[in-house]
């Protein structure tokens, strides 16, 4: 294998960026921990945990990148994919569910010989797709855009705010975050690896996309970011020796607690400025013209329309009738 340099993805020397000698299909594979990787460039960021039980993925990426994702995982390990955990319902996170799951193998091997339960309990012998019920609701809706085949839907859905399992000698928690980026967001915490997969609650490439039409809200976004901060630990007191909890955002580079704090503070500050302008009876157009996110536009507002979308989402969220 050879080491490659990818600008902006490594946050410190403890993170290695590796590519196999053969082509990685344009994807960036970041070694986060000895048995933990992040795959970037396939839509939303994908987390890969590897151990004796097999492979656990968080997110499957965009449908168009499925073959490249499968190839990248095979270069990391020959072990089968056992679980695909969905962190949200957006197409760039769940688009690869069907094909990726079918490259894996169920953990419920005792049911494979029973035709009455094999199709549901074992996902037809494929890897299980695990997600909060809100994600299943979004993906299976008649008017879902894009529409998803049934084999892409979660095969195990849970209603409670917390789902826990143990794979590869590690506790894994899936923590539902209501009304944040949307109504279908979850954090996935890997306890021993000390990694949190945040989905699009945190996006290091732009202002957060708050999907009001699908249940998102500015207060829910802030609440979720506060929860994310609580889940992370800074590398104190040995800040020059160790690293703290790693956070895999929905898009962009690997992060740590301080970057989550900065992102939360940015969201709160812009929210507060918009709220103050609303109190002054400013219209949405007037608020946009005032550029309340100006201090952060060069960092998070370079994509077309993203700043106005963020301001509009804050305005509509704050002025919505209770």
Q: How should these model regions be labeled?
A:
Residues 5-16:
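Bacterial N-terminal signal peptides
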Residues 14-20, 106, 236-244, 253-322:
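Accessory terminal helices/loops
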Residues 21, 26, 31, 54-56, 60-64, 116-180, ...:
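Metallo-beta-lactamase
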Residues 27-74, 186-199:
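Conserved beta-strand hairpin/beta-sheet module of binuclear metal-dependent hydrolase folds
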Residues 35, 49, 59, 73, ...:
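Divalent metal-coordination and catalytic microenvironments
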Residues 52-56, 64-115, 125-127:
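Active-site metal-binding motif and surrounding structural segment of the metallo-beta-lactamase
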Residues 106-123, 234-242:
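Intrinsically disordered, low-complexity Ser/Thr- and acidic-rich flexible linkers and loops
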């Amino acid at each position: 294998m050879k080491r490659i340099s990818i600008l902006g993805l490594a946050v410190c020397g403890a993170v290695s960026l590796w590519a196999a000698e053969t082509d990685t299909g344009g994807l960036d594979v970041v070694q986060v921990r000895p048995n933990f990787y992040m795959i970037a460039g396939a839509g939303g960021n994908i987390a890969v945990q590897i151990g004796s039980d097999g492979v656990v993925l968080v997110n499957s990426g965009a449908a168009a990148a499925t073959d490249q994702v499968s190839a990248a995982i095979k270069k990391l390990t020959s072990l089968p994919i056992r679980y695909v955990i969905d962190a949200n319902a957006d197409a760039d996170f769940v688009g690869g569910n069907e094909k990726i799951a079918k490259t894996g193998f169920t953990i419920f091997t005792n049911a494979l010989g029973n035709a009455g339960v094999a199709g549901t309990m074992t996902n037809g012998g494929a890897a299980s797709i695990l997600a909060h019920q809100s994600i299943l609701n979004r993906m299976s809706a008649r008017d879902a855009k894009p529409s998803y085949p049934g084999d892409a839907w979660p095969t195990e859905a849970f209603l409670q705010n917390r789902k826990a399992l143990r794979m590869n000698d590690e506790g894994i928690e899936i923590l539902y975050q209501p009304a944040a980026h949307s109504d279908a967001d979850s954090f996935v915490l890997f306890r021993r690896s000390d990694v949190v997969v945040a989905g699009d609650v945190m996006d290091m490439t732009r202002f957060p996309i708050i999907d009001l039409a699908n249940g998102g809200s500015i207060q829910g976004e802030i609440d979720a970011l506060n929860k994310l901060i609580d889940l992370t630990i800074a590398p104190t007191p040995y800040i020059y020796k160790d690293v703290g909890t790693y956070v895999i955002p929905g898009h962009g580079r690997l992060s740590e607690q301080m970057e989550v704090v900065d992102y939360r503070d940015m969201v709160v500050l812009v929210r507060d400025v918009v709220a103050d302008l609303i109190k002054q009876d400013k219209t949405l157009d007037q608020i946009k013209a005032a550029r309340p996110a100006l201090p952060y536009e060069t960092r998070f507002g370079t994509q077309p329309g993203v700043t106005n979308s963020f301001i509009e989402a804050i305005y509509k969220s704050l002025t919505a009738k209770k």
